[in-house]
Each structure stands twice: as C-alpha cells, then as structure tokens.
Amino acid sequence: MGKVIGIDLGTTNSCVAVMEGKEPKVIENAEGERTTPSIIAFANGEKLVGQSAKRQAVTNPRNTIYAVKRLIGRNFIDPMVRKDQGIVPYNIVKADNGDAWVEADNNKYSPSQISAFILQKMKETAENYLGDKVTQAVITVPAYFNDAQRQATKDAGKIAGLEVLRIINEPTAAALAYGFEKSASKTIAVYDLGGGTFDVSILEISDGVFEVKSTNGDTFLGGEDFDTRILNHLIDVFKKENGIDLSKDPLALQRLKEAAEKAKKELSSAVTTDINLPYITADSSGPKHLNIKFTRAELEKLVDDLIEKTIEPCRKALQDAGFKASDIQEVVLVGGMTRMPKVQEAVKKFFGREPHKGVNPDEVVALGAAIQGGVLNKEVTDILLLDVTPLSLGIETLGGVFTRLIDRNTTIPTKKSQVFSTADDNQHAVTIRVFQGEREMAKDNKLLGQFNLEGIPPAPRGLPQIEVTFDIDANGIVHVSAKDKASGKEQKVTIQASGGLSDAEIEQMVKDAEQNADEDKKRKELIEAKNAADSLVYSTEKTLTEYGDKLSSDDKGAVEEALAALKAVLESEDTALIKEKTASLTAASMKIGEAMYKAQSESQPAAENATNDEKIVDADFQDVEKK
C-alpha cells in the first residue's frame, strides 16, 4: 500500500500532509507555502489554481471562484445559497438537478468539480514531494456537514483521481494531531472557526482512544462572513462620503474583499489599520479613492453577533455530551479565525479557561488527516478513533412526522432497524423518504433522498411489516434498506441527495479531469518550449551582433536562417515544431561560440603585452657602482 495523504479541504485555504516515519508532516506547495488558497480561476482558456488564481482575482472577478465549500451539497433554493449570491462577484446558477452550481468562462461547474481542481493541486503537491504517484487520501469535512455534503466531497475526491479512504471530521482530525503520542487522559473541546464553517466537538482522549462524545456547529458561519461585514461597512462609508454604491461593481467588490480580509488579519495583532484603495471607481468629477482608518474596536462591534453565534453550539455540545464547561480540561483552537483576540476572549469566557494555542490552527487538521491515513495503511498503530453522526436520521411517517431511527451524536459506524406498516388498505408500494435534522416535522429537516419499495402483497392497512434499516458507515455516509417481511422483497440504496451527482456525471467529470490534466501538461510543455525558444532567440541575436563579423559568410547565413525559422514558429501552438527549430538554432549557433572562443584566444597575447606595458613606470635611479 502506497502513501495515504491527508487533505484539509478548506473554504479559504487547503493543506496537505503525510506521515514521514512516525510523524505527520505538512507538505509545501510549488510556491513554498504550507497552505494553498482554495481559489480557482479561468482566464484565456487556462485554469489557474491557488495563489496564481488569487493574484489575478482583481482583474478577473467574474471567472474567479472562491469559498465554493459553502455551496457543496446544497440546493439552489437554499436560503444560505441565496445569501451568498448577493455577495460573491461570480455567478451561482441552478443546475438541471436543482443543485447550486457556479458559472465561469461560459461553462457551468458543480462545487464538487471546483473542489476536485483544488484536490488535484494538493495531490500534485504531494506527488512532487514524495516523487511517487498518490492515489489514496483522507479528506476532512466540517463535523456538521450533512450526508449530501459528505457525499459531494467524496465525489470531488473521485473526480480528482483519488480513492477517498475516509471522510473525517475536522475537529476530530485536529484532536488526533493534538493528542498524538500523548499518554495523558483528557476531556477536550475543539473549537474550530474556519473560513466558511464553525464546528465544536467534545472528545475524551485516553491511551490512544479518541472518542467523540458530541458535536455541533454551523456550516454557514466563518471568516467569509467576517470579511463580508467589513466589506459592507466599507461600501456604506464610501456611499455616505461619495454617493456611489460600490456593491454593483464586480471589480470594486473584489478589491474591497481583499482589503477586508487583509484588514481583518492585521487587526489580530494591531489595534488600528489603514485601508487605502486608490482609483476604486470614478464619476463625472474624476477618479475616486477609498481611504479609511479602521480600528479593532470597530471590527469587534461589526462582528460581535457572529462571535456570539458560536457560543450556543458550544452550549449544546456540552449538554449532549453530559458535561459542564468546568469538566473540559483543554480547549483546542482550530481555524484561522481563532487568531482574532475577541474570539479567544469569548472562548475563555464561556469555558472558564485560557484556550490552548500550541497547535498551528491552519495546519493541525491536515496533520490529523495524515495520522488517520497512517492508521488506515497500518503505518500508525495503537490509535482508535470513535466519531459520531452530527444529525439525527429518520424517515417521514403518517402526517408528515419525522420519525428518528438514529439520534445525533451516535457513535459511527452504526446500524439501526425499525418496523413500519402501510397507511392504506391493499397498498402495494411505499415511498421511503429519508431526512436528516432535529425538527419534529419531516418537511423542516433536510431531505436526503427517497426510494420506493414495490410488490407488497394486498393486505389491510397496518398489517404488512416493512423493516427499514439505516446503516451509517465510518465516513458518515448513509445507506438505507427497506424489506417487506412477508414477501421478502427488499430495496437497498446508498442515499444520494435529491440533487447530487449521478454516477454517470461523476464518471464524465473524472474523464474531463483526466483530459484537463493532459491538456494542462501539454500547455505547460508548450509554454516551457516557447520560453526556451524566446531565450535562445534573444541570446543568439545579441551574440550575432557582437561576434557576427568573426563568422564566415556561410556560417553566418546558416545561423540567420535558423534564427528566422525559429522566430517564424514562436507564435504557433506546435510544441514539437518549436522544439525542432530550437534544436536547429542551437546547433547552428555553436559556430558563434567557436568564433567567440577563437577571438578571445587570439586577443589574449596582446592583452598580456598590454598588461606588461601598463606596469612600466618612469623612475629615478642611481648607479651604485659609480657612487
């Protein structure tokens, strides 16, 4: 079994790690950074991933996709999706299956596809470091992700060419990294406030056993929301001062978003910062500039309710675990937003203790995923991870009631069966509608999917016995079966969201990804060939100007001919032809090199004589013998 990589697929940034010997290690990307922006851009037929995509976002806002994790596994009509639509500069569109997709460069992409591009970058980063092909991974998700979101994340891994051995909850991964090779028994809380999601998990750690007691959270609360508050504040201030609404200008929005994120980070260590955006827009009176002094106190006032929103899930998680805040021996901070002093203050106030800051909040989740990868391929022993399902699972029964089969915070994997019956006389089929959530009425919860059980023998209502079995695997993904006990008829299904990607769609996206990988490789090869050719043209022209008179007319003609031939194909898209003409010019220009060395060797004796002459100076001297 090869190396299993651990990937933290984040809303804002992603990170990849691997077990090296007995220690997990974060792998640096090609730019030398330990995290990669979760940003994809499409520009002039090219796909950019990570830092290169982020750099050009200001000039290409419509085709630069970020924070797609907030859309994954969500329906287009989801209120949270509608909320994001008014904020992001790119288009969020309705897919044929009702899901929220994104549009860029006149193409539609599912959030799973966009996530797959980021995962491919992580995969390449690991392969470049390991010098070997990587095919297996453990990918992290927010603990409060529902089944549809988990399935969509697994689909993203498949599209990226990865076998996803395990989907692991982010706080659980962080706890693994925190408690790795520590023998002390502890009850800990992991407070994870990332770029787009918030989770809190309560765990008991003892002798290598990591048992999650409860989890809670909000999959639409994170750093992006903090950025939006600052962004809206800047828009309001500018509108009051200049009477211009910047919210309608995608270019200005992108610049404001970057400035908001930068200011937020700076105010974690400073108490005041200047936001300067020259030429943010223009009107009939000329260009307009944005120049605002922004303080930490102003920021804290803007986001106070967002920080407060993280406290209620903490309270619920403690209650579900059967603990009081005073029972928690350590609070581990995870996610970039936990660097904010006001967040740390709120955590300290609620739990009554100083939070633990000994882990890197940007890297700890990927490290934990790598440890879990090590467990799965037997590199790491003596660790047992017991996770839970974050939400209750059940089916819709008579009157639209939500009947729970598996309660939230049940340890997974788990299996539960319950017998139901028909609602009408001689009913020959039943529709099983599967929901996930905590509300009492089915319609108020998340519909995961539905299927039919047909061929039930005619009988009075209430007589047939239909056994419904829920099976949740270690990834937190739901499998459901329904069986008529009288006829033995059975229907099994792995729940696919009412939207979601079909197997055929995933297969097509896998092929597209492979094809794009080939095209990207070819594109890179073409660019490298053009760069080499361009460099050779420049150096040949320069040396030809300096030493052309030293060449015979035949040699000079051959070089000029090869030079003209290469210049003629520089703009072509034919890599082989460019390489061929580059090789021809390289061979022809060797004559220039010979002429250069010959000229240098001929001038050397003269140079030496010149040097000796330079040492002769006039001097007075006396003839000693005549003295």
Swiss-Prot record:
Modified positions (Phosphothreonine) in chain numbering: T197
Keyword Chaperone: yes
Region of interest called Disordered, as start-end residue ranges on this chain: 598-627
Keywords annotated in UniProt: ATP-binding, Chaperone, Nucleotide-binding, Phosphoprotein, Stress response
MF-aspect GO terms: ATP binding; ATP-dependent protein folding chaperone; unfolded protein binding
Highest taxon above the source species: Bacteria
Pfam families for this protein: HSP70 (PF00012)
Keyword Metal-binding applies: no
Induction of the gene: By stress conditions e.g. heat shock.
Compositionally skewed regions (Polar residues) per UniProt: 600-610
Record's compositionally biased regions (Basic and acidic residues): 612-627
CDD domains assigned: ASKHA_NBD_HSP70_HSPA9
HAMAP family the record matches: DnaK
UniProt similarity note: Belongs to the heat shock protein 70 family.
Role of this protein: Acts as a chaperone.
Name of the protein in question: Chaperone protein DnaK
Species: Rickettsia rickettsii (strain Sheila Smith)
Gene that encodes it: dnaK
